[in-house]
């Protein structure tokens, strides 16, 4: 969802949002298959762009549009 850079580290950020917990927490939507896909995509991007240092983070956003969201940041999540 987002590619950012902090110092010499490129950060791939997956953002997941849920308005209710009926389907689970936002971060629970990142299945093994999704993680594998994210790792492959990040690895390919890093190789193509000669990036040595990178990580994958996750931002989980919970809440309804009419309420203040709860935002959780998972560093090096994948």
Go through the PLM ranges and name each one:
Residues 2-22, 32, 38:
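Conserved catalytic cores of phosphodiester-cleaving nucleases, focusing on short active-site segments
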Residues 18, 25, 69:
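Residue-level signal for pocket-adjacent positions within structured domains
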Residues 21-52:
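Mid-chain, well-packed structural core segment of small domains
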Residues 47-78:
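Domain-level recognition of nuclease-like catalytic cores that cleave nucleotide substrates
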């Amino acid at each position: 969802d987002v590619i950012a850079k902090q110092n010499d580290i490129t950060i791939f950020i997956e953002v997941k949002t849920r308005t209710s917990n009926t389907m689970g927490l936002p971060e629970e939507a990142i299945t093994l298959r999704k993680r594998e896909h994210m790792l492959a995509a990040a690895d390919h991007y890093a190789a193509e762009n000669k990036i040595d240092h990178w990580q994958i983070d996750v931002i989980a956003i919970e809440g309804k549009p009419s309420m203040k969201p709860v935002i959780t940041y998972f560093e090096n999540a994948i």
